[in-house]
From Swiss-Prot:
SMART domains: SERPIN. Has an important role in epithelial desmosome-mediated cell-cell adhesion. Keywords: Cytoplasm, Protease inhibitor, Serine protease inhibitor. GO terms for molecular function: serine-type endopeptidase inhibitor activity. The record marks R339, C340 as: Reactive bond. This is Serpin B8. InterPro entries: Serpin_CS (IPR023795), Serpin_dom (IPR023796), Serpin_fam (IPR000215), Serpin_sf (IPR036186), Serpin_sf_1 (IPR042178), Serpin_sf_2 (IPR042185). GO terms for cellular component: cytoplasm; extracellular space. It is found in: Cytoplasm.
Length: 374
């Protein structure tokens, strides 16, 4: 599973950097685990060059038995309890007139716990779209209401793959609401007032000399999941950190031996972000081109009609960070047709930063984002 987690992590950092390149002032938030799992499920039905390109884009070239690995990984990261909930759910929605191969359907159920629900896109496109959106809304506790926008499916749609991931966690050390107050958040362009939370407690913290930047780990109750924040030093632009960042460096910078537990004053803004992406262009730039072209797409491992290209890869994510903890939801739909010399160290996130929600045991990045504009 280590090779798979490394592949997923590399894909996560690659996509984070690409999504951020378009506009350095734009907030970014997505679930790489959600994306990797749904695209790898599609990969089961891909053959030839289509499969090779998908494997390369997903960094899966040396990951062994990928689907068995995902079976274990998805089981490992799913956790629940009164104070921490993480759920992943997969489903295939297929045109009822299509002849999907039994082996493909069985593999989706076996490795991704994904059922195939047959719908009639040809006869009632809009009703099918609403049905899929309702399923995602249910699986994300209403946080994601419309993964498929108007016009994203058509009478020609043959297969929609949907993966929903939902997380709600409480901080192990909760912030006290009475200490939250308005404070300036500094971007390159201006200052904006944010509701800044405050907590003084023992946290794991480190400093990256190379960039330079601070690293802070905020664990959730149960300690299986934690939020990692990568905050550039006061006079360092976040773009410098993003340019230097690779998955290998992320793993090094956030490794237990690089972080020291100490009493620290933490200032963290309340966050509430919602982001939507059409990822076709980004996946194409990662070399995954044949899957989107009817003349080249080879999904003969999925259906007798192999030349049925993907027509849309939609991803929508929601995150809320407050004094109690974090609520995050992500859904993907694929439509086919420390260093501190002070006595009391301070971690003050009053300027743009990167953040990650990580499963500690497997080192898997479940969500990642950039907060640069309140």
């Amino acid at each position: 599973m280590d090779a798979l987690c490394e592949a997923n992590g590399t894909f996560a950092i690659n996509l984070l950097k690409m999504l951020g390149e378009e506009d350095h002032l734009r907030n970014v938030f997505f679930s790489p685990l959600s994306l990797s799992s749904v695209l790898t499920m599609v990969l089961m039905g891909a053959k030839g060059n289509t499969a090779a390109q998908m494997s390369q884009a997903l960094c899966l070239n040396e990951s062994g038995d990928v689907h068995r690995g995902f079976q274990s990984l998805l089981r490992e990261v799913s956790t629940s309890g009164p104070k921490c909930l993480l759920r992943t759910a997969n489903r295939l929605f297929g045109e009822k007139t299509c002849d999907f191969l039994p082996a493909f359907k069985e593999s989706c159920q076996k490795f991704y716990q994904a059922d195939l629900e047959e719908l009639s896109f040809a006869e009632d496109t809009e009703e099918c779209r609403k049905h899929i959106n309702d399923w995602v809304m249910e699986k994300t506790d209403g946080k994601i209401s419309e993964i498929l926008g108007a016009g994203t499916v058509s009478p020609l749609t043959k297969l929609v793959l949907v993966n929903a991931i939902y997380f709600k966690g409480k901080w192990n050390e909760q912030f006290d609401r009475k200490h939250t107050r308005g404070m300036p958040f500094k971007t390159n362009q201006e200052k904006k007032t944010v509701q800044m939370m405050f907590k003084q407690a023992k946290f794991k913290m480190g400093h990256v000399e190379e960039v330079p930047a601070q690293v802070l780990e905020l664990p959730y109750v149960g300690a299986e999941l934690s939020m990692l924040i990568l905050l550039p030093d006061e006079n360092t632009d976040l773009a410098v950190v993003e340019k230097a960042l690779t998955y290998e460096k992320f793993r090094t910078w956030t490794s237990p031996e690089k972080l020291t537990e100490e009493k620290v004053q933490v200032f963290l803004p309340r966050l509430k972000l919602e982001a939507s992406y059409d990822l076709e262009a980004f996946l194409r730039s990662l070399g995954m081109t044949d899957a989107f072209e009817e003349a080249k797409a080879d999904f003969s491992g999925m259906s007798a009609k192999k030349n049925v290209p993907m027509s849309k890869v939609a991803h929508k994510c929601f995150v809320e960070v407050n004094e109690e903890g974090t609520e995050a939801a992500g859904a993907t739909a694929v439509v086919r047709n420390s260093r501190c010399c002070r006595m009391e160290p301070k971690f003050c996130a009053d300027h743009p930063f990167l953040f990650f929600i990580r499963h500690r045991e497997t080192n898997s990045i479940l969500f990642c984002g950039r907060f640069s504009s309140p």
